[in-house]
A protein has these predicted regions:
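Short, structurally constrained coil/turn elements
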Residues: 14, 69, 442-445
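Bacterial N-terminal signal peptides
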Residues: 7-14
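A generic structural signal for short, solvent-exposed coil/turn residues
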Residues: 12, 67-69, 88-90, 247, ...
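Sec/Tat signal peptide C-region and signal peptidase I cleavage site
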Residues: 16-20
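A Zn2+-metalloprotease active-site environment signal
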Residues: 21-415
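Positively charged n-region of N-terminal signal peptides that target proteins for export
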Residues: 1-5
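Short helix/turn-capping signatures at newly exposed starts of structured segments
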Residues: 413-554
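Residues that line or immediately flank small-molecule/substrate-binding pockets and catalytic motifs
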Residues: 8, 129-130, 552
Length: 554
């Protein structure tokens, strides 16, 4: 049995401002001023609470984007109405500009409203929307320049900035912001902008686009969540396709990292049990059946591991300080048998990146766990024991398990199924009622409007509200002829229910272990742990239950 470590991320808005003549919160100025206009020092606000609050949101969004291939823009706040743009990406100065009036317009929405505005502008920058507007300005007299300066192009840029900016704000921890139409109305009102313009989408069109974009964003988040759940239960090849679907639409270090993790874990299924004595600290970044081996298993696993290395390199290219990718790269090299490179990436790259500003303290501990495995495999038992013991004092459950393996201590037995045990339910629904809602039904109930076809053979379905505080995700893999359906029924915020063994949200890890025994599979995160049992998953934050998931395959 292999254990995996998972870290936690997540994914994800604005709109353009408008004057009667010019409209944008994007790549085109919204007032009478042109991009690059220099403000006097008095017009730029700093060292005041509003600026500090907005700067904190900006910094979190930049960190969540994790793309440092381009210089990070400077964030400035302009006094009052500034240049009349509300929020603006100034490419000449490489500044994201937020005006005081725009800040005040989104006050009631807190940091989530600011993330909506600022995330929109950062998306213009990272998606290089400025190239088009710059081309139009320089070659506007040519036919191609005139064609590019079309309303449809502006709509496309603004819609993409809403969509990917929303994903960015979500990934930075600000949730799915659903007040965009209200906020844009307040911005228009604050600036006295008209609702119609020849050169920009109308206010009503803008609001309609926001609602549609929110729906698309929800689908993308749901696909990402499904990928994480599939990874947790070991459906790695299937999870890879879900991650790939997201990566085509949104690129980030976490997505590339998770693509690589899926390949590493799939490769681990190609090892014999005696080849994987220890548990490797592979880290899946969340925001969440090995069969018989043929003669080509060794070459297949090497191919998978080398594919994983390419994905980790892509994540590192976006953010050279992203410690989890270095650690996962080290794990891949260790599994390839290259202990020299594995030790270098764990001891030097992963550890140094993790300890820089103490951004990834858990990853630093996990690096020690991997080095301990390398020492043990090299016969340096005492050094391995010291590393595992030190990591155990830092509350590493994985280190404790590896220490037991090193000492030949018996591991806790897997929980036994108890005859007559009350079935697990969420919102009063048994998994049987979810997977077979009507006797002899071939497919669970789902919302057709939310169906996504990821490939010709893989579909994602869901029932968004089987009960008041739960959701259902269904993966339909037609290539799997024995168990094509994987069904997850999970709690959502506010669920007051209990499991069959009286465990509820907020209960501690010890209570779960007392009720269910030690999990046969655990997945570490920087803020907690995922405990995977035969038909139930517990997701912990700070050793407290944040949500649980019932699941089945059929």
């Amino acid at each position: 049995m292999k254990a995996v470590l998972i870290s936690s991320i997540f994914l994800f808005c604005l709109l353009p401002g408008v004057s009667a003549q010019h409209r944008t919160i994007g790549t085109i100025p919204l007032g009478g001023t042109q991009p690059g206009t220099t403000q006097s020092p008095a017009d730029k606000m700093a060292a005041i609470p509003a600026y500090k609050q907005a700067l904190s949101v900006f910094d979190k969004l930049v960190e969540a984007r994790g793309d440092f291939r381009l210089p990070v823009p400077k964030f400035v706040m302009l006094k009052g109405k500034g240049n009349g743009n509300a929020a603006f990406m100034n490419y000449l100065l490489n500044e994201v500009q937020l005006e005081e009036n725009a800040f005040n317009a989104c006050k009631e929405y807190g940091d989530a409203g600011l993330a909506f505005l600022i995330g929109h502008e950062l998306t213009h920058y990272y998606e290089k929307h400025g190239w088009r507007s710059g081309f139009v300005q320089e070659y506007g007299d040519l036919p191609i320049g005139l064609r590019l300066n079309k309303l449809t192009d502006k709509v496309a840029n603004e819609t993409e900035a809403d969509y990917l900016g929303g994903f960015l704000a979500y990934s930075a921890g600000y949730g799915l912001f659903d007040k965009g139409p209200e906020l844009i109305q307040k911005v228009y009102t604050a600036y006295g902008w008209g609702t119609e313009s020849e050169n920009y989408p109308s206010l009503s069109d803008r609001q309609a686009l926001l609602l549609r974009t929110k729906e698309k964003l929800e689908r993308l988040i749901e696909v990402f969540e499904m990928a994480n759940l599939l990874t947790a239960i070991g459906s790695y090849a299937e999870a890879y396709e879900y991650y790939r679907y997201v990566a085509i639409r949104y690129q980030s270090r976490e997505i590339y990292n998770n693509l690589g993790v899926a390949k590493v874990l799939e490769a681990m299924n190609e090892f014999e049990a005696n080849e994987l004595v220890y548990r490797y600290p592979v880290e899946l970044d969340l925001s969440f059946s090995a069969g018989s081996k043929g003669s080509g298993a060794g070459s297949l696993r090497d191919v998978l591991l080398r594919q994983a290395l390419l994905q980790f390199d892509a994540a590192i290219s976006m953010d050279p300080g992203y410690a989890p990718a270095y650690l996962n790269k080290a794990c891949a090299y260790a599994l390839l048998g290259d202990s020299t490179r594995a030790r270098f990436y764990a001891d030097k790259e992963a550890r140094n990146a993790a300890l820089d500003n103490n951004q990834y303290p858990k990853t630093a501990v996990d690096a020690d766990v991997l080095i301990g495995i390398l020492e043990a495999k090299s016969g340096n038992t005492e050094q391995a024991k010291k590393l595992f013991q030190a990591a155990t004092t830092k509350d590493s459950k994985l280190a404790a398990i590896n220490l037991s393996i090193l000492n030949n201590d018996p591991l806790p037995p897997a929980p036994k199924e108890k005859v007559g045990l009350k079935p697990e339910t969420i919102d009063g629904l048994k998994m049987a009622a979810i997977s077979h809602p009507i006797d002899n039904d071939l497919f669970p109930k789902y919302d057709e409007a939310k169906t996504i076809e990821l490939t010709d053979n893989l579909g994602f379905n869901q029932n968004p509200a089987p009960g008041p505080n739960s959701k259902v995700y269904i993966s339909n893999n037609s290539l799997n002829t024995t168990e094509p359906l994987t069904i997850f029924h999970f709690t959502t915020a506010g669920n007051k229910g209990k499991t069959a063994k009286n465990i509820g949200l907020g209960d501690g890890r010890d209570a779960i272990v007392t009720a269910y025994g030690e999990a046969p599979r655990t997945i570490e995160t920087p803020i907690g742990q995922i405990m995977v049992y035969k038909q139930i998953i517990f997701i912990l934050k700070d050793n407290k239950l944040e949500r649980w998931v019932n699941y089945t395959r059929r």
